[in-house]
Structures are given as structure tokens and as C-alpha cells.
């Protein structure tokens, strides 16, 4: 690792510093050529931000190379000042021109690179994530892979609402419109550089040769909204990408974890291979629970009780609302996914077909009354959890809202929720979907609304297809949070 490299840029008229990390093999032989990853820093950072005192890319890369997830690569970390790695709107500091026309050729000349776009990637966090998406999208002839970690993407509404001084410094100086308010800030130049706009304005075919990986934590202060909008936009336009939302915020530790998947994504992309789907948990039909069915009018309720159910003990009930989706996620399959939790935490599952309930005009209170007369539980919201999948998810979601919610803990797997209430009163919400799930717009809109209402919410977007096993895996991954609610008195 050498943090003290530099060259003179004729385009910018000054020295440009950069750090370089060479693989161990590079120094031990003299003929091999290597792919290159350019790493971009965040606002206020510099060429050392990916170094030992920052994200420590050497430690991450060494571990990923040792376990065979990625080949030895050259990593270049240039200083980007506070440019968003774009040309300045007035042409006075054309950083991207320097990057493409001077820095990339210089690296190919100074080091033994493959000098091919097929083995050249650009990655960045925060401001650098914005830059990584923008550079690769505008220059697909130079880059084949773009990695955005918590890219600094503001929705138009957020962009307009930023404080004047902060906006002038960080955005107006780079993209024009300094001193402007309202929609005057949304200059044509800004739109040409911002991923939320150029992905929307240009044909999808423009971006077909670049492979995108985007990751943004659900605890981000602001950026969760812009990144969620970007994922929905890319899905709507059928632009291939990998998208992740994990538990975390705008921190080095979050991005270090991101790179553990981003680097294998780069490796697969360099090979021209599709990135593999998630490794799914394998479920059997083995279930340590007993089935009991009850009727509410013309509607059926499917109960699953732990094999050691004891009517002298008090149980909490997970109400499962089964809607229509791409898979037939039965109540039994949910019980299989949560089997161990049912045994350990004294939980009963009560499942119903939501369309049947709506057709028969069966109120949720009638369901809870029938269940609470059948099993030993308590008749209050703290003893009721809700889990919904697929269509008509409003039926159960609405039980978590209002001044007297019927359920205090709400979980959703790839759910389609249309009528969002601002009165979110449940004690926890947990939303899960794969990045190729059907209801990506709906579940993100719910998350966005819950965050705006400052409701306690966990949100996950996982790698994977819209499949039965993936849905079960998502529900299984909720076990910790469901279990936490079960042990509360």
C-alpha cells in the first residue's frame, strides 16, 4: 500500500494525489497483468480514506483474495476533493474529464493492468457512491462495473429542502444554481449528472453494458429515500442491478461489510458471469407442531400449536395473513420456517386467507375472538403479532395503526400494501423482500412512510428471486426480531 503517489493534471492544472494498493503477487513476478478497481471517497475525504485508518481496503481485499472470492487486483484511490467526481457546471474544474482522460490512462501506463474495461471497476461510498454511478454510466466504454455504497442521492424534495448555506457549499458550487431555492436548484446540469435523473431520462439500453451493485443501510438519516427510489426506478426500467438494504447507517463499518459482497460481485462481473442468487436455507416438512382448524362464520382459521402446547401456559399468537403472490406460501410453510421459534418462545401461528376474509366480510376482531377462545393467550395487542405476505396486505397492516391497534408487532414479507396510514402505532415493523421481489414499490413506500413518521422499523432487501424458499428464508431471518417481541412481558 502506497499513499503517496501523484501526477500533474494538465486538465486541472495541479497535482493530483492518489493511493495505490498492489497485490502481493505483483511484487513477486514481473509479467502478470491485473484488473483495476478505482475507489472513491466521501465528502471531506481524500486519497487515504480507503487506507488503514479508514475503510482499510487492504484487509478486506486480502481476506477476499485468500478465500478465493476474488482474484488479486490493483486498487487506486484518488483524491476527489469535494467534486462528486463530476465536472464542475461552469467548466472551471473538470474532474471527470481528468479521471477518464488522464488518470485511467496513467494507471494503465504506470502499472501492469489488463487495460480493458472488462476488468475495470469503480466503487465509492457516499459522495464517492454518487461518483461511481455517474462515472460508469457516462463512460461505459471505460468501466464495466459500478459499486455504489450509500450513494449520496437526495430525492428532489430533499434537495429542494436543504439549508441554503449547506446546499450552496455541497451542491450549488458543483452543479450550478448557487443561491437558488425551490425547483430552481434542479438545474439541467445537475439532472445530467444525478443517477436519479439520468437513469430516468435515458433509454435503458444506454446502461446495458455496466453491472451495478448498490447497498444502503436502513438506518441512514436521509439517503435511504433516494436509494430506495433509485432501486424502484431501475426495476421499473428493467436495468439489471443488485440492491441490498441491511441493518446499519452511514458508517465505515457498514461499508466494510458491503465490500465483502461487492468484491465477489466485481469478480463475477470480470468473468462475465451472472451474480449467483443467495444461498437459501433448506427447509424440510418436519414440523414440531400440531394443526387445528377453526371456523369464523364461513371463514377458515388454520392454527399451528407447538407439540408441547400446555393450556396452563400463556402463549402469544402470530396472525398470518396469506395473500396472493408468485408462490403459494401456506400457513404450514410459515410454521416450518418458524418451527424452532414456536418451541422456544411459546408461540402459536394462526393463518388465514385474506381474500376469503374480505369476501366473507370477516372482521379481524372476529378472528382474534375465535382464536383467543380456542388457545390460552391474552386478549390484548401485546400478545398479537402480525405477518403478511403478498396481496391485500392492508387488511393486517391496518390492525397495527390507529389509537388502539389490534396488533403491536407487524412483519411483512414481499407484501403489497396500498392504503398507508400515517398513524403508525405498532411497537415494531419489520419489512423484508428480495431485490427481485414483486412488491418492491409497495414495500419501499411503506418503509419510506414509516421512517417519515419516525416509527420503529427494520427494512431488509436481500439478494434473491421471488420464490417460495426465498420467502421462507426471509421469514426465518425475522426470527430474532419476532423472538425479541415474544419474550417481552
List each language-model region with its residue ranges:
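Non-catalytic cap/lid and distal C-terminal segments of serine-dependent acyl enzymes
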Residues: 1-489
Amino acid at each position: 500500500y502506497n499513499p503517496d503517489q501523484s501526477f500533474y493534471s494538465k486538465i486541472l492544472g495541479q497535482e493530483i494525489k492518489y493511493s495505490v494498493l498492489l497485490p502481493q503477487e505483483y511484487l513477486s513476478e514481473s509479467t502478470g497483468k491485473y484488473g483495476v478497481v478505482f475507489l472513491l471517497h466521501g465528502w471531506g475525504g481524500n486519497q487515504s480514506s480507503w487506507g488503514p485508518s479508514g475503510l482499510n481496503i487492504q484487509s478486506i481485499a486480502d481476506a477476499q483474495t485468500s478465500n478465493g472470492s476474488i482474484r488479486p487486483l490493483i486498487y487506486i484511490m484518488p483524491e476527489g476533493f469535494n467534486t462528486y467526481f463530476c465536472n464542475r457546471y461552469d467548466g472551471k474544474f473538470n474532474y471527470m474529464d481528468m479521471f477518464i482522460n488522464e488518470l485511467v490512462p496513467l494507471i494503465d501506463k504506470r502499472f501492469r493492468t489488463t487495460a480493458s474495461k472488462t476488468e475495470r471497476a469503480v466503487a465509492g461510498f457516499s459522495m464517492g457512491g454518487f461518483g461511481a454511478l455517474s462515472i460508469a454510466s457516462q463512460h461505459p466504454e471505460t468501466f464495466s462495473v459500478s459499486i455504489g455504497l450509500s450513494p449520496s442521492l437526495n430525492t428532489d424534495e430533499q434537495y429542494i429542502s436543504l439549508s441554503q448555506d449547506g446546499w450552496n457549499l455541497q451542491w450549488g458550487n458543483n452543479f450550478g444554481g448557487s443561491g437558488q431555492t425551490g425547483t430552481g436548484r434542479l438545474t439541467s446540469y445537475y439532472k445530467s449528472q444525478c443517477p436519479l435523473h439520468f437513469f430516468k431520462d435515458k433509454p435503458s439500453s444506454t446502461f446495458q453494458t455496466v453491472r451495478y451493485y448498490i447497498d444502503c443501510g436502513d438506518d441512514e438519516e436521509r439517503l435511504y429515500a433516494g436509494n430506495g427510489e433509485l432501486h424502484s426506478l431501475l426495476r421499473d426500467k428493467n436495468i439489471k442491478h443488485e440492491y441490498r438494504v441491511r441493518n446499519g447507517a452511514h458508517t465505515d463499518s457498514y461499508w466494510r461489510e458491503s465490500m465483502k459482497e461487492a468484491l465477489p460481485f466485481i469478480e463475477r462481473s470480470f468473468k462475465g458471469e451472472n451474480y449467483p442468487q443467495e444461498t437459501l436455507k433448506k427447509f424440510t416438512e418436519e414440523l414440531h407442531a400440531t394443526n387445528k382448524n377453526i371456523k369464523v362464520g364461513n371463514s377458515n382459521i388454520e392454527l399451528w400449536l407447538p407439540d408441547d402446547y400446555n393450556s396452563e401456559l400463556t402463549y402469544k399468537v402470530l396472525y398470518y395473513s396469506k395473500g396472493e403472490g408468485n408462490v403459494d406460501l401456506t400457513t404450514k410453510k410459515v410454521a416450518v420456517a418458524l418451527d424452532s421459534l414456536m418451541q422456544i418462545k411459546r408461540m402459536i401461528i394462526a393463518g388465514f386467507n385474506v381474500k376469503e376474509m374480505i369476501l366473507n366480510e370477516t372482521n379481524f376482531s372476529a378472528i382474534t375472538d375465535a382464536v383467543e377462545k380456542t388457545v390460552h393467550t391474552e386478549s390484548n395487542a401485546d400478545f398479537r403479532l402480525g405477518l403478511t405476505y403478498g396481496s391485500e396486505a392492508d387488511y393486517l397492516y391496518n390492525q397495527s395503526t390507529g389509537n388502539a391497534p389490534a396488533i403491536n408487532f407487524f412483519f411483512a414479507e414481499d407484501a403489497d400494501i396500498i392504503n398507508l396510514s400515517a398513524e403508525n402505532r405498532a411497537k415494531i415493523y419489520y419489512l423484508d423482500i428480495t431485490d427481485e421481489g414483486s412488491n418492491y414499490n409497495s414495500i419501499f413506500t411503506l418503509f419510506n412512510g414509516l421512517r417519515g413518521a419516525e416509527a420503529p422499523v427494520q427494512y431488509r432487501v436481500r439478494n434473491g428471486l421471488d420464490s417460495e424458499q426465498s420467502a421462507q428464508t426471509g421469514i426465518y431471518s425475522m426470527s430474532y426480531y419476532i423472538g425479541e417481541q415474544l419474550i417481552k412481558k
